C-alpha cells in the first residue's frame, strides 16, 4: 500500500511543473504578440474624426461634420454654371473619406437614361427595360455603380444633348469615381467579360470610339460616336462639358452652330447643332487643346454599329465554344462574383493581342443600335420593317446567355427570350 504522504509529494511536483510550463508558454506568446505588433503592417487608417477605418471596405456610414464643398451654396449642379477647382475639391473629399482611396483610380460609375414618358412604339418600353437590364448585368459583374436618369435635368437640353447635364451631375455626386461611363439607352453590351483597358488611358481624360483620319482628312460627322464614352472625373472634363454645351440649346448662339458645323462636315444629316458634331468640331478646330487628352479608340468595339455586328452572333458563339472545348478551365462552374477571373483567363489564353472589329475572334464589346429609335419607333427608313427590334432582341439574348450561363441556363434560340434551356454539366463538352 502506498504511503499517503508520498502521493501528496508527487502531486505537488506535477503542479509545480505545470505552473512553470504555463508561465513559459504565456511568456512565449507575449513575445510573439509583441513582435508582430511592432513589425506587422497595420490594416487600418484613420478617419477624419480620428477613428480607425478598416481598409478592407468602404465606410459608407461616415461623413465628417466639418463643412466641405457640398456645403458651399454657390456650388451648382446646373449645366449652366461652371465648376472650378474640382480636382482640389475631390482631393479634399478623399482626405476626409480615406476608405474610398484604395482602388479609386479604376472606379467607374455607369450612367444611362431615357425619356420620361411612355414609348410610342408598342415594343419600345420592353426593349428599353431589357437594355437597362443588360447594363445592370454588366455593372454588377464588374463591380460598377450605375445611375439611370429618365428626366431632363435642364428643360432646353433635350434629345441627344440631355446626357451632358446628367454626366456633370454624376461627376459631382460621385467624387469617389475616377470615370463616368455614359452609355446610350440603345447601346447593348454584347461581351460581358471584356473590360476597357483603363491603363491605356492614363494620360487621357475622354475615351470615345473614333478615327483621327476621318476627322482631320475627311471631315465627317461620323468620325466618332458620342453615344458611348468614358470621361475622367476631373477639372479638365468639367471645362470640356462647359465648352461642349455652349454649342447646345442652352446657349444663346445655338442656332448659329448648326450651319457652322455643316459648313465643315458636309455629310452631317441634321440641320441643328448636335452633341456628336460639336465634339468633332472641338477636335477639328482646337486640335492642340483637345486631341492630346481625347483617346479615339478603334482597336475594339467601344461601340459597334449594329449593321456590321448582328450577322456574326452565331459564328462568334461557336468560336467561344471552341475555346471552352479546348480548355476545361472555361467550362468550370463558378460563382458570378468571380466571373472576372475566367474572363481574364480567356483573354490571356486565347485573345491576347487580338484586335476587335469585324472578322475578329472577339465578340463586339458594345453593339449600338444607332438609327433604330426603339422608343419612338421612327427608325431609319433604310432599315427593313421590324429588323431593328428583332435584332435588338437577338443581341440582348446573345448577351444574356453570357450572364445566365453562370445561373445554369441559356437561350437555345436567340430569337426567343423565354423559356431558357438548362445546361448539362461540363457544357459544351457535354452536348444538350
From Swiss-Prot:
<keyword id="KW-1133">Transmembrane helix</keyword>
<dbReference type="GO" id="GO:0005794">
    <property type="term" value="C:Golgi apparatus"/>
</dbReference>
<protein>
    <recommendedName>
        <fullName>Glycosyltransferase 6</fullName>
        <ecNumber>2.4.-.-</ecNumber>
    </recommendedName>
</protein>
<dbReference type="GO" id="GO:0005768">
    <property type="term" value="C:endosome"/>
</dbReference>
<feature type="topological domain" description="Lumenal">
    <location>
        <begin position="40"/>
        <end position="432"/>
    </location>
</feature>
<dbReference type="Pfam" id="PF05637">
    <property type="entry name" value="Glyco_transf_34"/>
</dbReference>
<keyword id="KW-0812">Transmembrane</keyword>
<dbReference type="InterPro" id="IPR029044">
    <property type="entry name" value="Nucleotide-diphossugar_trans"/>
</dbReference>
<comment type="function">
    <text>Probable glycosyltransferase that may be involved in the biosynthesis of xyloglucan.</text>
</comment>
<dbReference type="InterPro" id="IPR008630">
    <property type="entry name" value="Glyco_trans_34"/>
</dbReference>
<feature type="transmembrane region" description="Helical; Signal-anchor for type II membrane protein">
    <location>
        <begin position="19"/>
        <end position="39"/>
    </location>
</feature>
<keyword id="KW-0333">Golgi apparatus</keyword>
<dbReference type="GO" id="GO:0000139">
    <property type="term" value="C:Golgi membrane"/>
</dbReference>
<comment type="similarity">
    <text>Belongs to the glycosyltransferase 34 family.</text>
</comment>
<keyword id="KW-0325">Glycoprotein</keyword>
<keyword id="KW-0328">Glycosyltransferase</keyword>
<dbReference type="GO" id="GO:0008378">
    <property type="term" value="F:galactosyltransferase activity"/>
</dbReference>
<keyword id="KW-0472">Membrane</keyword>
<keyword id="KW-0808">Transferase</keyword>
<dbReference type="GO" id="GO:0005802">
    <property type="term" value="C:trans-Golgi network"/>
</dbReference>
<feature type="topological domain" description="Cytoplasmic">
    <location>
        <begin position="1"/>
        <end position="18"/>
    </location>
</feature>
<keyword id="KW-0735">Signal-anchor</keyword>
<feature type="glycosylation site" description="N-linked (GlcNAc...) asparagine">
    <location>
        <position position="315"/>
    </location>
</feature>
Amino acid at each position: 500500500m502506498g504511503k499517503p504522504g508520498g502521493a501528496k509529494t508527487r502531486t505537488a511536483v506535477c503542479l509545480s511543473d505545470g505552473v512553470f510550463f504555463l508561465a513559459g508558454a504565456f511568456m512565449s506568446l507575449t513575445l510573439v504578440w509583441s513582435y508582430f505588433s511592432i513589425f506587422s503592417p497595420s490594416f487600418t487608417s484613420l478617419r477624419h474624426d480620428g477613428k480607425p477605418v478598416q481598409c478592407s471596405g468602404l465606410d459608407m456610414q461616415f461623413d465628417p461634420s466639418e463643412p466641405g464643398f457640398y456645403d458651399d451654396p454657390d456650388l451648382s449642379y446646373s449645366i449652366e454654371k461652371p465648376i472650378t477647382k474640382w480636382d482640389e475639391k475631390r482631393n479634399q473629399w478623399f482626405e476626409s473619406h480615406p476608405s474610398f482611396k484604395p482602388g479609386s483610380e479604376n472606379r467607374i460609375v455607369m450612367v444611362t437614361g431615357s425619356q420620361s414618358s411612355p414609348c410610342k412604339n408598342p415594343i419600345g418600353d420592353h426593349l428599353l427595360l431589357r437594355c437597362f437590364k443588360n447594363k445592370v448585368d454588366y455593372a454588377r459583374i464588374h463591380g460598377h455603380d450605375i445611375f439611370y436618369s429618365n428626366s431632363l435635368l435642364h428643360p432646353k437640353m433635350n434629345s441627344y444633348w440631355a446626357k451632358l447635364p446628367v454626366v456633370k451631375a454624376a461627376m459631382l455626386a460621385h467624387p469617389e469615381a475616377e470615370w463616368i461611363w455614359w452609355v446610350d439607352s440603345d447601346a447593348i453590351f454584347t461581351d460581358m467579360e471584356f473590360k476597357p483597358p483603363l491603363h491605356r488611358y492614363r494620360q487621357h481624360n475622354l475615351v470615345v470610339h473614333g478615327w483621327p483620319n476621318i476627322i482631320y482628312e475627311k471631315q465627317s460627322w461620323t468620325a466618332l460616336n458620342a453615344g458611348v464614352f468614358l470621361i475622367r472625373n476631373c477639372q479638365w472634363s468639367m471645362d470640356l462639358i462647359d465648352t461642349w454645351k455652349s454649342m447646345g440649346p442652352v446657349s444663346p448662339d445655338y442656332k448659329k452652330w448648326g450651319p457652322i458645323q455643316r459648313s465643315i462636315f458636309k455629310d452631317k444629316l441634321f440641320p441643328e447643332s448636335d452633341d456628336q458634331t460639336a465634339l468633332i468640331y472641338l477636335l477639328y478646330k482646337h486640335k492642340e487643346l483637345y486631341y492630346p487628352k481625347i483617346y479615339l479608340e478603334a482597336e475594339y468595339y467601344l461601340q459597334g454599329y449594329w449593321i456590321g455586328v448582328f450577322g456574326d452572333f452565331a459564328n462568334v458563339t461557336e468560336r467561344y465554344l471552341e475555346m471552352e472545348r479546348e480548355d476545361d478551365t472555361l467550362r468550370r462552374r463558378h460563382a458570378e462574383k468571380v466571373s472576372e477571373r475566367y474572363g481574364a483567363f480567356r483573354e490571356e489564353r486565347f485573345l491576347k493581342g487580338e484586335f476587335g472589329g469585324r472578322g475578329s475572334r472577339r465578340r463586339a464589346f458594345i453593339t449600338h443600335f444607332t438609327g433604330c429609335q426603339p422608343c419612338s419607333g421612327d427608325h431609319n427608313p433604310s432599315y427593313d420593317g421590324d429588323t431593328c427590334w428583332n435584332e435588338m432582341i437577338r443581341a440582348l439574348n446573345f448577351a444574356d446567355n453570357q450572364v445566365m450561363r453562370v445561373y445554369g441556363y441559356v437561350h437555345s434560340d436567340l430569337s426567343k427570350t423565354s423559356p431558357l434551356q438548362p445546361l448539362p454539366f461540363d457544357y459544351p463538352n457535354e452536348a444538350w
